[in-house]
Design a protein with these regions (language model features):
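Binding-site signature for planar aromatic cofactors or substrates
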Residues: 1-145
Length: 145
């Protein structure tokens, strides 16, 4: 991934992730916890109760659409379930690492893209605290080298 895309994903972002179901149909879902671990790896917190994790178990090929201010990238790669049960999310999630094999800039010359954002309803601000610890777990421990 180019450096500016890695930098964008280092802090954690929301992305659209596509998996392949048992009938070989693409299935998309919005994943709120996506982090770049390094230029070749993106990690995801994937709900263990949903279809995406079942799909990844059967077919590890995934696509990720990254949308942000002046960013529009398509990533393709192979997913590996690194941890069946993450400790930090408020609901059951697996930690999935994706080895990025293809990066495509989907931006268009002369077009300014303003990325998606979200906010919390009144009384739900505590969810921002969950995000902080989930993103930290997805980043993993600091390198030992």
């Amino acid at each position: 991934m180019p450096p500016h895309l890695v930098q964008f994903l280092l802090g954690g972002q929301t992305c659209v992730v596509a998996t392949v179901d048992e009938h070989r149909w693409p299935t998309t879902t919005l994943m709120t916890w996506v982090v770049a671990r390094n230029p070749q790896t993106v990690t995801l917190a994937v709900d263990t109760r949903g279809k995406s994790l079942r799909n990844i178990r059967k077919n590890a090929h995934v696509a990720i659409e990254v949308l942000g201010d002046d960013l529009c990238y398509g990533l393709r790669g192979v997913a590996v379930i690194e941890k069946e049960e993450m400790q930090s999310p408020p609901f059951p999630c697996a930690l999935v690492a994706v080895r990025i094999e293809d990066v495509r800039d989907h931006g268009a010359a002369g077009v300014k893209f303003v990325g998606p954002t979200y906010s919390y309803e009144t009384g739900k601000e505590h969810r921002a605290g969950f995000e902080k610890v989930v993103f930290a777990e997805l980043k993993g421990p600091p390198p030992t080298i």
